[in-house]
Amino acid sequence: MNPLIFTTILMTVLLGTMIVMMSSHWLMIWIGFEMNLLAIIPILMKKYNPRTMEASTKYFLTQATASMLLMMAIIINLMHSGQWTITKVFNPTASIIMTSALAMKLGLTPFHFWVPEVTQGISLTSGLILLTWQKLAPMSILYQISPSINLNILLTMAVLSILVGGWGGLNQTQLRKIMAYSSIAHMGWMTAVLVYNPTLTMLNMLIYIMMTLTMFMLFIHSSSTTTLSLSHTWNKMPLTTTLILITLLSMGGLPPLSGFMPKWMIIQELTKNSSIILPTLMAIMALLNLYFYMRLTYSTSLTMFPSTNNMKMKWQFETKRITLLPPLIVMSSLLLPLTPMLSILD
């Protein structure tokens, strides 16, 4: 793709998301979503082959359906309230349809069906954009309409997303699918606390983006797309493999790593505002995610696959250094001591 065209398309993706996040008018929000959708398709299809074509088509159809539902909810809300502002969703039917549309855009259960298939069919770089930047716009709208959302529907979606995100990733060998199911589970954690403490949801989103960005950059750096190819990186780049292990454990939510902080604060917030059953269920279901993270770390760093090379370390050219990677790894693993400073979120 021509660099100028690619830059223009990328800037349109960024502009579409920024329009959604900064607008208070429903029509402008819908236009921002459409700009973002039409511009992201060529990025997903950058490496043109039948797999990327299929993945892009699935993504387009899903997001177009979600946009249609969103416009329907906007019109119903307009008929009942007579205003285009995003301050409140006045009609319960409009609220349910709007929540479903945004859940489809985010990949929440039961609208999660497209996330693993689309992520698997595209490149690692496109997958990174899909699982991080593309979550910002719908989550910002959910954040703004959180007082109007039906709590029971949102909590049901959240719990099912954590369950499906853990269960779906158990027998996967493809790293992109594992990251997709991980994304579904993390979205579940975010939406579970959205009504009670929206600011905590945004904190969780920030830490999730940092951890996912770190993981994808490490996968790109080691050229790994499957658990088998990842297990061979120990011979080539042991430091990168160690960093992958630490980041995976952080994504699983193990203390004293950064990923433990949002889970801890979300469970604390839910315990304050609702019964003890919901946070207990969420913590138990999070063990499914932790299991496949631990299995991945075991196959990556604690097993040595047979190799025809007798040398422990393989000879290789000097790999390209990524300047952004060290600070991202630090933030993805060492933010837990900052937790007392975040007491303001209460």
From Swiss-Prot:
The keyword Transmembrane helix applies. It is found in: Mitochondrion inner membrane. One of its GO terms (cellular component) is mitochondrial inner membrane. The chain crosses the membrane at residues 3-23, 25-45, 59-79, 96-116, 122-142, 149-169, 178-198, 200-220, 242-262, 274-294, 322-342. Its EC number is 7.1.1.2. Pfam families: NADH_dehy_S2_C, Proton_antipo_M. One of its GO terms (biological process) is mitochondrial electron transport, NADH to ubiquinone. It comes from the Eukaryota. It is a multi-pass membrane protein. Belongs to the complex I subunit 2 family. This is NADH-ubiquinone oxidoreductase chain 2. It comes from Equus caballus.
